[in-house]
Design a protein with these regions (language model features):
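Extended amphipathic alpha-helical scaffold segments
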Residues: 181, 199-218, 246, 282-294, ...
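A transmembrane helix-and-boundary motif of multi-pass membrane transporters/channels
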Residues: 1-216, 223, 323, 327-571, ...
Length: 672
């Protein structure tokens, strides 16, 4: 019920209040028509981490300018055709929202802001289209002022850097990866380990989202952006590697080969010693030699070969991860030439995006706006412009959620709860206030208290709803005016927009956790089907980036869905392993003779058919024919002499283990 009173929370609330009051003061000093917009904006853009405020600031300003330009272009030209104007603004908001949802970086704010800013400026200006340019300039200055004040205060007054938080998250993640590897090598229950470590995928996605703010950070760690990117690539690869390693250890149960057992013990000792880089290079060379030493085509031999290949890749990823981690404390820490080059690579890994859902969200926003406009026009409601404006804002604010309706309802309820407080201030307290210093003292108690809740993700929505409702209802201007009719009309418009946002979103856009999880699974299965049918391997880290991102989103949804019938037998981590095995197999394909390629292609086509059937809702059990195809491909690849054959065999062994964990042991030769 009560907020946390730690140092970071108190400082955030004080900084946010200072930024809001600074924006309000400058707004008064400049004679802006609605200085309260600057105050409200300062709270909306405030974030606990300074880098997050700074990274979004530029995109927010650009989005506001673009939205204002759209309003200036549309309103004067279509004001005499109200239906067309409403349609144009609704389509603008819906289109901007849909495109913004395809980008989960701070860049998305540019288009989202440009969408609902056009509505904020355009709809209230229909009665005075000739003044649209002046109104647009005023709104841009007011909103830009709020963004600027929040950015300056959170950057200069005891900023909390993203880099410090990110460094701790990376250190914790790498430590958990080390413990996962040790648990696997000590022979712990592989399935239980994988289940316990699935949250590492969600943590990897969270780290990626934090990392996008790092170039804008206030600390010197912003110079380590390339190191974080390279580190994240190793994280993406480690999740399927460690999961696959656990599977091979579980399949082998007991390893009698003394050299292999000694290698496993050496890897265990190396991890326990802190994964020193020099010893890691020696271990990788030793493991690669062991893996290249052919032990025949028996199933146990192929499993050992696959185990050693996985172990070598795991040691490499862990060694590189620890070497990169050392760069945070020592910028001159040595790196191999290849690793050094990876820290200088540009670009960003792709993340999961759902185009159909984005289009549906944009369509729902457009329809909610049009229904609000119809109510406004047909009722002849003079102050009804607030309805389509708030419909646009609500649909945009919560579009990224699976089911936005509960959040929109909650926002509406807390906005309603803010009205009694707003009325007390407007009609009882503010009329007695004279001068800005006294206004600041009067506004401090509610705003400072609400600011304590914003850093808590569970309570931030409720706090912002009360705060925005309170601030917008007061509508502080240079000359105070308390008009009950305007107060009631403006707030009524908000709730009409809220109502249409709820109705349309519930009818078109909302989905439960089951449906959301199912969509993600289907997208993953379709990706695996396409990869299996391709004849060229994608870059491993790039493919892993999307699969791990989906796994991070999917894991909490599957946990919430529980053991429902639709998800019995679903293992998202297994699907990730299958994907990385397919990458390894596709990479080995080009070095095979024609007969080996034909066998491999038949197996890959069978895997593609299996996952395409899964995506279409067919039974989950793979066919015996697919097992026969994989075994035929294994017979050809296990005797191949190409250097890439070890990785190919490891990939096929992984496919067999993941798709047919209960199948009898592979038979190398068919008796004639």
């Amino acid at each position: 019920m009560f907020p946390k009173f730690d140092r970071h929370t108190l400082l955030f609330s004080a900084n946010s209040f200072a930024a809001a009051m600074l924006a309000l003061y400058i707004g008064f000093a400049l004679g802006l028509p609605r200085p309260y917009w600057a105050m409200t904006t300062a709270y909306i853009v405030s974030q606990p981490l300074a880098g997050a405020v700074r990274s979004k600031a530029l995109y927010r300003v650009l989005g506001t300018v673009l939205g204002a330009a759209a309003a200036v272009a549309l309103v004067p030209n279509l004001v005499n055709a109200p239906v067309l104007l409403c349609l144009a603004l609704a389509l603008w908001v819906g289109g901007c929202l849909a495109i913004s949802l395809l980008d989960r970086t701070p860049r998305s704010y540019l288009l989202m802001l440009s969408g609902y800013t056009a509505a904020i400026i355009g709809f209230p200006s229909v009665n005075q289209p000739g003044a649209i340019f002046d109104v647009a300039v005023s709104r841009v200055i007011e909103i830009g002022l709020g963004i600027l004040c929040a950015t300056l205060v959170h950057s200069l007054v005891f900023p909390r850097p993203v880099g410090t938080v990110l460094k701790q998250r990376l250190f914790t993640w790498l430590g958990e990866a080390d413990r996962w590897a040790l648990d696997v090598l000590h022979g712990e229950d592989g399935e239980a380990i994988a289940r316990d470590r699935r949250h590492l995928a969600a943590a990897a996605s969270e780290i990626q989202m934090l990392a996008v703010h790092l170039p804008f950070d206030t600390s010197r760690l912003r110079e380590t952006t390339g190191v974080v990117r390279a580190m994240h690539e190793r994280m993406l690869v480690l999740i399927p590697l460690l999961s696959g390693l656990a599977d091979r250890m579980e399949a082998l149960r007991e390893i009698r080969d003394d050299r292999v057992r000694a290698a496993l013990n050496a890897v265990t000792a190396w991890i326990e010693a802190g994964s020193p880089r020099d010893r890691g290079l020696d271990l990788i060379e030793r493991l690669d030699k062991l893996a290249a030493h052919r032990r025949g085509s028996a199933w146990s031999a192929l499993l050992i070969e696959s185990l050693l290949a996985r172990l070598s890749a795991t040691v490499r990823a862990l060694a590189e991860g620890h070497a990169l981690m050392a760069r945070f404390d020592d910028p001159d820490a040595p790196l191999s030439p290849g690793l050094e080059a990876s820290t200088r690579a540009k670009g960003q890994r792709a993340m999961h995006a759902d185009l159909p859902l984005a289009l549906l969200s944009g369509g729902a926003a457009a329809i909610a706006i049009l229904l609000s406009c119809a109510t406004w026009i047909l009722a002849g409601w003079g102050d009804g412009a607030a309805a389509p404006v708030m419909a646009a804002v609500f649909c945009c604010f919560f579009a990224a959620m699976d089911d936005p309706v509960p959040a929109i309802k909650s926002f509406g309820v807390y906005t309603l709860l803010s009205l009694p407080l707003s009325a007390i201030y407007m009609f009882a307290i503010l009329p007695a206030i004279d001068g800005f210093p006294l206004l600041v003292l009067t506004m401090a108690p509610p705003l400072l208290f609400l600011g304590l809740y914003i850093p808590d993700p569970r309570r931030a929505g409720a706090a912002l709803a009360v705060l925005m409702g309170f601030s917008n209802a007061l509508a502080l201007q240079e000359m105070f005016s308390a008009d009950f009719a305007s107060f009631l009309n403006g707030n009524l418009g908000q709730f009409v927009g809220l109502l249409f946002a709820i109705i349309v979103t519930a009818g078109l856009r909302s989905m439960g956790v089951d449906a959301s999880a199912r969509r993600l699974l289907v997208r993953t299965w379709k990706s695996l089907a396409r990869l299996a049918r391709a004849r060229q391997a994608p870059e491993a880290a790039a493919f892993a980036a999307i699969l791990v991102d989906r796994l991070g989103i999917l894991t909490p949804k599957l946990a919430e869905a529980g053991a429902r019938h639709d998800f019995v037998g679903v293992d998202a981590l297994r699907d990730l392993r299958v994907g990385m095995n397919l990458v390894a197999v596709q990479a080995a394909r080009s070095d095979l003779p024609p007969e080996g390629k034909d066998r491999l292609d038949a197996a890959l086509d069978g895997v593609g058919d299996h996952f395409a059937a899964l995506a279409a809702g067919a039974a989950r059990k793979p066919s015996d024919e697919l097992l026969a195809r994989i075994d035929a491909a294994l017979r050809g690849l296990s005797i191949a002499s190409a250097a890439s054959a070890v990785q190919g065999v490891s990939g096929l062994v992984g496919l067999r283990r993941n798709l047919f964990p209960e199948a009898p042991a592979f038979v190398p030769e068919i008796a004639r």
